[in-house]
């Protein structure tokens, strides 16, 4: 049968005799409920929209290849990095964060940077952003951030007041806010931005020696950004500009590439680090912990069906392979639960069987998961009729002790420790970042901040000016001027203690 001569069937293979005219009682009569095809189509249509992601709802994705270019086996025995030249299939998804599925691509927002590597030891998901830091360092605040940047419960509109009230109520957010208000808060598209694992992770080698690492992905297309005015003009013509750019580039054979690097910190260095090395609001300075090249990934194949491969792509930081591991980063620890849990709600417990999520490097035929049943369990025969318990006399579900990780270093008593008593150095790094900007770039930070804070209350504006001033007096004065506020009217020595306690 020719491709253009496919004949319509129902979902269970029955031929459809008429796809335009319903079955009725007479030519002008009411619809008959025995019109099985109509019932099937409408009931499926009523259920075809799945829950969108709570964050990162609007996204674009592509398949590609990761290639090792430098030997890092002294740090890790992960097979993906076992030899120079080794290639691994992968999938990448880029996204905005705050907007819904129908939001414009060009918003002043963080961009998600999620990678899935199909290794022979299972899928490795690295769920990052285009910024190296985040707004806070304890995952208990994540629900509040989500609500603050989404729609107001009364007006159902995005609220700069809610957004900035939250951001300025959490002083450690200034580092991320500074990046967001800078040129890099509005990437031209997904191809022209860097990516970061953001969190601190760890690696271990054959000797069981552990090091702490941060992942960096540097675009080989160069960094390009838009101003607010440029972005607004483009959004008026094309709300999918970033998605279109990525898709068209790959279709035209202009495959985007990113180089992968790591920063490495030993356990001894971590003990003596001046700040908490697992604090997601801070970076490790490259002068102290230089970038080490690892490899390069290239995106070279567009999905054949967006829903199948991009909308149903499920990432979770718990998807990690031998040789790689986690860290005490409190935000990472929270995400270890929330991501997988969200995917099970959104896609079901068997979402690992969806093609884009399948562990292709292992092969379904080589897997032996203990989980059974659940909606849409079909791919592996539900493990057949063998034992569904352990131990059993068939020897099924044997552990693989050769993959046991080295001991994870922890200490201390279980307690709700006040993070602000441990570290209140919120402003040093954003101050250094501000001073690295050119004069023109600083002016754009001031302008972008004023644009973003339009309609925000005076007390919240004062709070932000105070934080900026503590990072660098020039920063605070510039923001105050852009907001048309006399800096002499701002309490520059105040604190956020009372505000924070209200969260």
Curated annotation (Swiss-Prot):
GO biological process: hydrogen peroxide catabolic process; response to hydrogen peroxide
Any matching Pfam family: Catalase-rel
Catalytic reaction(s) noted: 2 H2O2 = O2 + 2 H2O
EC numbers for this chain: 1.11.1.6
UniProt keyword Heme present: yes
Enzyme class name: oxidoreductase
Enzyme active site: 56, 129
Source organism superkingdom: Bacteria
Annotated region described as Disordered, given as residue ranges: 1-26
GO molecular function, one term: catalase activity
Keywords carried by this UniProt record: Heme, Hydrogen peroxide, Iron, Metal-binding, Oxidoreductase, Peroxidase
Presence of the UniProt keyword Oxidoreductase in the record: yes
Assigned GO CC terms: cytoplasm
Residues the entry annotates as binding heme: 339
SUPFAM superfamilies: Heme-dependent catalase-like (SSF56634)
Requisite cofactors: heme
Disulfide bonds: none
Similarity-based family: Belongs to the catalase family.
Subunit structure: Homodimer.
Job of this protein: Decomposes hydrogen peroxide into water and oxygen; serves to protect cells from the toxic effects of hydrogen peroxide.
Protein name per its UniProtKB record: Catalase
Organism for this UniProt entry: Staphylococcus haemolyticus (strain JCSC1435)
């Amino acid at each position: 049968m020719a491709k253009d001569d496919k004949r319509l069937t129902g979902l269970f293979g029955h031929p459809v005799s008429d796809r335009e005219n319903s079955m009725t009682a007479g030519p002008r009569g009411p619809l008959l409920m025995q019109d099985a095809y109509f019932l099937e189509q409408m009931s499926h249509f009523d259920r075809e929209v799945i829950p969108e992601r709570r964050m990162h709802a609007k996204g674009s994705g592509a398949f590609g290849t990761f290639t090792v270019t430098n030997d890092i086996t002294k740090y890790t025995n992960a097979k993906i990095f076992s030899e120079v030249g080794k290639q691994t299939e992968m999938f990448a998804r880029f996204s905005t964060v705050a907007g819904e599925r129908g939001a414009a691509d060009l918003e002043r927002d963080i961009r998600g940077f999620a990678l899935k590597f199909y290794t022979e030891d299972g899928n490795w998901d690295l769920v990052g952003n285009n910024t190296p830091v985040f707004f806070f360092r304890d995952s208990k605040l994540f629900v509040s951030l989500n609500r603050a940047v989404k729609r107001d419960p009364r007006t159902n509109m995005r609220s700069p007041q809610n957004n900035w009230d939250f951001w300025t109520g959490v002083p450690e957010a200034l580092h991320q806010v500074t990046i967001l208000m800078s040129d890099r808060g509005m990437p031209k598209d997904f191809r022209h931005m860097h990516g970061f694992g953001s969190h601190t992770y760890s690696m271990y080698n054959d000797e069981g020696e552990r090091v702490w690492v941060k992942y960096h992905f540097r675009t080989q297309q160069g960094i390009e950004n838009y101003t607010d005015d440029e972005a607004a003009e483009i959004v008026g013509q094309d709300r999918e500009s970033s998605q279109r750019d990525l898709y068209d580039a790959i279709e035209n054979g202009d495959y985007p590439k990113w180089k992968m690097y790591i920063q490495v910190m030993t356990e001894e260095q971590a003990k003596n680090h001046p700040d908490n090395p697992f604090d997601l609001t801070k970076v490790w300075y490259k002068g102290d912990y230089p970038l080490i090249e690892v490899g390069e990934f290239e995106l070279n194949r567009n999905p054949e069906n967006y829903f199948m491969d991009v909308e149903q792509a499920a990432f979770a930081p718990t998807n990690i392979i031998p040789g790689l591991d986690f860290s005490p980063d409190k935000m990472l620890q929270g995400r270890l639960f929330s991501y997988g849990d969200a995917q099970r709600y959104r896609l079901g417990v068997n979402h690992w069987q969806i093609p884009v999520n399948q562990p292709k490097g292992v092969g379904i035929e080589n897997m032996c998961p203990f989980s059974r049943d659940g909606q849409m369990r079909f791919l592996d025969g539900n493990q057949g009729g063998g034992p569904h318990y352990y131990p059993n006399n068939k020897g099924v579900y044997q552990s693989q002790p050769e993959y046991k990780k080295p001991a994870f270093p922890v200490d201390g008593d279980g307690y709700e420790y006040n993070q602000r008593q441990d570290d209140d150095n919120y402003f040093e790094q954003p101050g250094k970042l501000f001073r690295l900007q050119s004069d023109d770039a600083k002016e754009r930070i001031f302008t972008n901040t004023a644009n973003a804070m339009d309609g925000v209350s005076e007390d919240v504006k004062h709070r932000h000016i105070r934080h900026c001033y503590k990072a660098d007096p020039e920063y605070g004065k510039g923001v105050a001027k852009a907001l048309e506020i006399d800096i002499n009217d701002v309490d520059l020595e105040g604190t956020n203690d009372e505000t924070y306690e209200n969260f």
